[in-house]
A protein has these predicted regions:
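Extracellular adhesion/carbohydrate-binding repeat motifs centered on closely spaced tryptophans
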Residues: 1-371
Length: 371
């Protein structure tokens, strides 16, 4: 049987399955000793048991199957998205017999890297459906484009160029996948969407590479140095407030100030001012925050070691007692009067430096097993 180790097997030898009639099986076979297998049905692979990444190209009412990848292969899983199917038939002489993997996560190499098999960090997570088909998004699934980010040395850093991706719910959790069916992780900034009801513009977080599920609510994330940073992402979709599930909050949330999900807090002084475009219309609201990111809203002198950092008393500054609208979260920003500021303000783009050409704003335009 295929699961039996054979150290003397020649590289050009293949496994075949003979039906009760004595004929060699070919194509997808759903019940070979209770498991599904895929056998070649092309002239150059007829009857050969196909393993690892297997692609089927539509041919009339059936498919023509072949192994994807190899040392000289340039094939991508996305090549089969619109007119084919992809299976993962895990084969290991000691552990797996080559049957179709179903209804599970599988961490493995891309087809073009399958023969290297030397770096675990080059593996990606894929989702295999109940029928065994690997989830490879087609053009109808690809609802958004954006950029991947890593939290490097205290700042989010762009990882690669703009790309397209799809959103999929698996076991009640939301995931993003790229065109080759690779699960995304870390941060993704959505800058273009075809349907804001499916994926809204903004920053999202999916945990580390061993997780990948969309995060909501308060999150603490460590950068490459092990330093912790706080974020807040929407917990549900709410058309009234503009909150979107998983999307990083900008503005006042629970009296803390956030920019695209990142907590904005005083760093160099006990208190610092922040000028932030909360509404996304180019107009900046003025806030005062402390070192915990809590928004201050009293008309007094904000001091440190006897020095006045920010004076909201002299000009009798008034602060907003509620948001300007249901979708503009600027409560406790300055409404009347002007602050006397004796310290540097916090530039949220320094805290979270995202180049302006990839900041999502405005309206819609046309490890271990994942948890």
């Amino acid at each position: 049987e295929p699961s039996t180790a054979d150290d003397d097997a020649d590289a050009d030898e293949y496994w075949y399955y003979l039906k009760s009639s004595g004929k060699v099986a070919n194509g997808k076979q759903s019940n070979v000793k209770g498991q599904g297998f895929v056998f070649g049905n092309k002239d150059d692979n007829f009857g050969q048991m196909l393993t690892n990444w297997v692609g089927g190209t539509k041919d009339g009412d059936s498919y023509k199957y072949e192994e994807i990848g190899g040392e000289d292969s340039v094939a991508q899983l996305s090549d089969y998205a619109s007119n084919g199917v992809v299976y993962y038939c895990m084969y290991d002489e000691d552990k797996a017999d080559g049957h179709i993997q179903k209804n599970k996560w599988r961490k493995t190499w891309r087809p073009e890297d399958a023969y290297e098999e030397d770096e675990d960090e080059d593996k990606y997570w894929y989702w295999l459906e109940k029928d065994g088909k690997a989830y490879i998004p087609d053009s109808d699934d690809m609802k958004a484009t954006g950029y991947a980010y890593d939290l490097g040395d205290g700042a989010l850093e762009v990882d690669g160029s703009q790309f397209s991706f799809a959103k999929k719910k698996i076991n009640s959790k939301d995931y993003f996948f790229n065109a080759d069916g690779e699960m995304l992780s870390d941060f993704v900034n959505v800058v273009h969407t075809e349907d804001a009801n499916v994926i809204d513009l903004g920053m999202y977080y999916f945990g580390g590479s061993s997780d990948g599920s969309m995060k909501t609510g308060s999150q603490t994330v460590k950068d490459d140095n092990g330093d912790s940073f706080k974020f807040y992402f929407g917990t549900k979709d709410n058309n009234t407030t503009g909150e979107a599930k998983g999307k990083g909050v900008t503005g006042n949330k629970n009296n803390k100030l956030y920019y695209m999900g990142h907590l904005v807090a005083a760093q160099d002084y006990k208190y610092q001012p922040v000028f932030m475009d909360v509404a996304g219309n180019g107009e900046e609201a003025t806030f005062i925050v402390n070192q915990n990111g809590s928004i201050q809203h009293s008309a007094l002198e904000y001091k440190e070691d006897g020095d006045i950092l920010i004076d909201a008393k002299t000009n009798k500054v008034e602060f907003k007692t509620k948001n300007s609208s249901s979708k503009v979260w600027d409560k406790y920003s300055v409404e009347k009067g002007s602050l006397i500021i004796n310290v540097e303000d916090i530039d949220e783009k320094d805290v979270m430096p995202i180049s302006t050409d990839v900041i999502a704003s405005g309206s819609v335009t046309s490890g271990s097993k994942p948890q």
